[in-house]
Amino acid sequence: MRLLKKLFLILLFFRFAYVFACDLPGHFDFDVSNSIDEEILYSGCYDTVNLGPHIIEYILTKERAEARGVKRPSASFTQDRDGGVLQSLLAENGYSLPHHRDYTRSGYDRGHMAPNGDFNDTYENALATFFIANIWPQTPNVNRVEWLRTENKTRTLASEYLFVKVIIIVDEFTEERVGNIQVPLCFKRRVYDLYTGELIYEIDVYQLMEPEESDTL
């Protein structure tokens, strides 16, 4: 009975804890699901002005946080990891998604917001994070050190709390661009205990330096 109550509260929090800001002009929401059981892996609000996700949110479980059996997919970031739904929606409204190649030799990494490391329970789930609407330009230091540190902290919290809700917000930008993609100034991570709704981790990661030498291909 206690477990059922906890699961009910988790689902209730998942339903009402956050409302996307996709009523903003030029913003569109999307979901990326597992094609086998149709589980929503992560959701987002896509910003067509700056060409990346304004918000990404998902639930991270202890099981997924501790999964180690899947090798990182060697894959390009495509426009159709959601089955092409967002791409079609944008096209209907006169917008389009960037391409994997837009980042090539830019000096910036393709930085996951929902990282493949949080979905390592199956290869398909990890691959689903390689969605062009799930990334922003990040300097190599931010992507591989500072932001990675926040991802590792989040996985530690998921192991401790069993279920956490992760919200990534990107709403501040530099004047730099990668092609037409605006380079973010700050990446904001908020992690909540699903059982209590308590904010248990909050961090803003700024990238103020010029991009370093990157092997982005």
Q: What residue spans do the PLM features occupy?
A:
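Domain-level detector of nuclease and nuclease-like folds
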Residues: 85, 92-217
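Generic detection of long, well-ordered alpha-helical segments
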Residues: 34-35, 46-47, 53-56, 65-67, ...
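Signature of the chorismate-utilizing enzyme
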Residues: 11, 64-65, 189
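Extreme N-terminus nucleophile/cap motif
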Residues: 20-43
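Short, His- and charge-rich active-site/binding loops that engage polyanionic ligands
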Residues: 39-109
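Classical Sec-dependent N-terminal signal peptides that target proteins to the secretory pathway
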Residues: 2-21
